[in-house]
Amino acid sequence: MTTAVTGEHHASVQRIQLRISGMSCSACAHRVESTLNKLPGVRAAVNFGTRVATIDTSEAVDAAALCQAVRRAGYQADLCTDDGRSASDPDADHARQLLIRLAIAAVLFVPVADLSVMFGVVPATRFTGWQWVLSALALPVVTWAAWPFHRVAMRNARHHAASMETLISVGITAATIWSLYTVFGNHSPIERSGIWQALLGSDAIYFEVAAGVTVFVLVGRYFEARAKSQAGSALRALAALSAKEVAVLLPDGSEMVIPADELKEQQRFVVRPGQIVAADGLAVDGSAAVDMSAMTGEAKPTRVRPGGQVIGGTTVLDGRLIVEAAAVGADTQFAGMVRLVEQAQAQKADAQRLADRISSVFVPAVLVIAALTAAGWLIAGGQPDRAVSAALAVLVIACPCALGLATPTAMMVASGRGAQLGIFLKGYKSLEATRAVDTVVFDKTGTLTTGRLQVSAVTAAPGWEADQVLALAATVEAASEHSVALAIAAATTRRDAVTDFRAIPGRGVSGTVSGRAVRVGKPSWIGSSSCHPNMRAARRHAESLGETAVFVEVDGEPCGVIAVADAVKDSARDAVAALADRGLRTMLLTGDNPESAAAVATRVGIDEVIADILPEGKVDVIEQLRDRGHVVAMVGDGINDGPALARADLGMAIGRGTDVAIGAADIILVRDHLDVVPLALDLARATMRTVKLNMVWAFGYNIAAIPVAAAGLLNPLVAGAAMAFSSFFVVSNSLRLRKFGRYPLGCGTVGGPQMTAPSSA
């Protein structure tokens, strides 16, 4: 997609968006970005999460030239035909491609492993053309199925870098070359007597090692791609939360429905109850209650009248508004919030995979050891073929197939156990930060509170009963769809019939109940000056807590006050206390008013409160905390929490929350119980410990076998044993996570990690 934008000093700037394919990690995104930024007059930013490169240039740069530059770097690029976001899922496509490669590789691996061992250990079983049969079965696995690793390894070589793919590719290639040399070389098979002599002296056919590494790593990469797809699906669906169509008001007063993306600035459009506001703008006519909670965190609907501002992405609850568009499309606050989420996720993805960090040191070390091994054999007077064989053996044994299982197995077991506890772990990259989390930031509406208004108190004037006041109010409010009315109506089942019902926008409702005129609404409308002192005291108390005070009047006489509030979750206080017991600092960050925020913080035990803050402000607070050296976990549920969840070191979203929050978070709390927040932190930490221990197992056996290979004593039995044992211990160690947590969800008690060592260890 190519658009004209306004740059600095009002200069015309051309913006081009390219969809990049072939990137396997954030390092790839950096390479593409660096390649594009080397072009004159080009400023590029590449988002690995969305696979989109956004290029701003003050020159007439041809998009084809940009695509060609990306291709020279080893990737594919095409011009975006939309706004850069697409319904397609690159991670899902990648997972499908990996599954096809995995299925074919797994089918071929079984006969390759059987025949390699049989022909190597028992030469008498070899038949005419056995070399061709074995090679025909193995080569598709080590070439086509393993091509994703070879492609990245070659790209890394061009950039003088090393990653996990480099290690895998080198190991597979070395094992394949050695095997081809063994099976096609003019070697006469040596007949051996005794089973141990046959096993320990078997010919060096390592096709099963090369194929096994390919299969095991493909398994891990497939599950990793699936997890990425699931993690990104909510963010890709974010655009669905905005309005699709808008009713534009024409000069003659008629309306015309057009696609929302065709709306222009200064055009007027109509919004009715239940509809989503299509753009940021100014209300010019009408009055309506607007649910702003998704954008600002304000629990109570906001009454918008002519001259009031409205925000795109919010929902009109009642009334009708005519709005003049001030910001449309990518310029709206909603679109800006989407960009904040994407940018924050892209920054979080900059952390390299743990395996890549290890490989960046391990690969050069192995190559040096292999070279020293060959040199040592030659200096010692060994034959050149023995020197080359020993060097290749070092490369073969250095590639641990369990490396591909180290992270996926831990994540699979942790995800299964987490599901039992009401916790869903979306990915492992950001979980590395959990070991150092020292600050937990909570949103208020929908996180610490239910997000639904409820009656918190009823105060009756002398001569009236609280139940009587509530019943009269509920009878009238039952005919209204206002959120406060719904809360009052739901507070009791005791109702009579109502007649002459009227709803006065911005004031309240009225009606006749059993021949008595009843009004329910704002104190200013009812006439609070003539109220009994206890009613005025109840109003002051409710408003000091950030609650809404609703007055009830019968036949012109004020008879009671009903306090309505966003109820605090029962599990909130215990969760905050559990975090404090773990030595964690807690904060409340909300767009709601200071009085309401302070009241909720006091009830749940949080000392630090920042209220009346916009979504961008939440991101700023998170960044300030991180700049001071804090490692921050954020717990939220709304659209307005998305950017902060993505920017935090660890984001936790309530499962019933919006797609934005879920898309931005690293951990989803499936059930609406906050007592699993500390347990989620514990599970994330335990998972990362398991992943790291798996890495030790994955590398440990192979590192121990390197001296054996360098000494020229390596054979398929040793290589196969190292592969099998390292994989076995990785899986066994991951299964320990099934013991995590003492209590299942719903018992009301947060259990600490209960992990025991596997019996095999």
From Swiss-Prot:
Topological type in the membrane: Multi-pass membrane protein
InterPro entries in UniProt: ATPase_P-typ_cyto_dom_N, ATPase_P-typ_P_site, ATPase_P-typ_TM_dom_sf, ATPase_P-typ_transduc_dom_A_sf, Cation-trans_P-type_ATPase_A/B, HAD-like_sf, HAD_sf, Heavy-metal-associated_CS
Recorded effect of pH on activity: Optimum pH is 7.5.
Residues annotated as domain HMA: 14-78
Superkingdom per UniProt: Bacteria
Keyword Ubl conjugation: no
UniProt main location, coarse: membrane
PROSITE patterns membership: ATPASE_E1_E2, HMA_1, HMA_2
UniProt cross-references to CDD domains, sorted A to Z: HMA (cd00371), P-type_ATPase_Cu-like (cd02094)
Keyword Ion transport in annotation: yes
Keywords linked to the UniProt accession: Acetylation, ATP-binding, Cell membrane, Copper, Copper transport, Ion transport, Membrane, Metal-binding, Nucleotide-binding, Translocase, Transmembrane, Transmembrane helix, Transport
GO CC entries: extracellular region; membrane; peptidoglycan-based cell wall; plasma membrane
Temperature dependence: Optimum temperature is 37 degrees Celsius. Active across a broad temperature range.
Modified residues (N-acetylthreonine): T2
GO BP terms in the entry: copper ion homeostasis
Intracellular or extracellular location(s): Cell membrane
Reaction catalysed by this enzyme: Cu(+)(in) + ATP + H2O = Cu(+)(out) + ADP + phosphate + H(+)
Activity regulation as described: ATPase activity is stimulated by Cu(+) ions.
Gene Ontology MF annotations: ATP binding; ATP hydrolysis activity; copper ion binding; P-type divalent copper transporter activity; P-type monovalent copper transporter activity
Protein family: Belongs to the cation transport ATPase (P-type) (TC 3.A.3) family. Type IB subfamily.
Name of protein: Copper-exporting P-type ATPase
Organism: Mycobacterium tuberculosis (strain ATCC 25618 / H37Rv)
Lineage: Bacteria, Bacillati, Actinomycetota, Actinomycetes, Mycobacteriales
Gene expressing this chain: ctpA
